Amino acid sequence: MIKRQNIIAVAQSWVGTPYHHQGSCRGVGADCLGLVRGVWCTIYGAEAETPPAYTRDWAEASGRETLIDAATRHLTPIAVADAKGGDVVVFRFRAGTPAKHVGILCARERLVHAMEGGPAIEISVTPWWRRRIVAAFAFPGVTD
């Protein structure tokens, strides 16, 4: 049984981790996907899936929803409106392009994520961010 508070605490422990493309090592370096992968590994004890090498424009080349497809393989899809602390949210920054960013909610209005240019941080989910959420997922077996 996995408690939401445990997921939130693990996600928050990544705050301050430097950005590193394709990284997934708390305190050393991670990108947005690496942060979620690292939280998964801490919670479940092993990686769900090792992603292939990817470039910064990886999804644009194929036009496929690679990030959402991978999330669907390992996480439980939920309605965006139902997402709360401990859930994973996926963002699309530009209409007509694949979703390319992911983070973990610490509360309905708080998010831990990693973006190029700075360390992993916890931010407010402002209206700008909220409008860009296109999918939400729960970790398997999570309980309140």
Task: Please identify what each model-predicted range represents.
Residues M1-T17, V125-D144:
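Non-catalytic ligand/cofactor/substrate-binding and regulatory segments of enzyme domains
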Residues Y19, H74-A79, R132-A135:
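Short secondary-structure junctions
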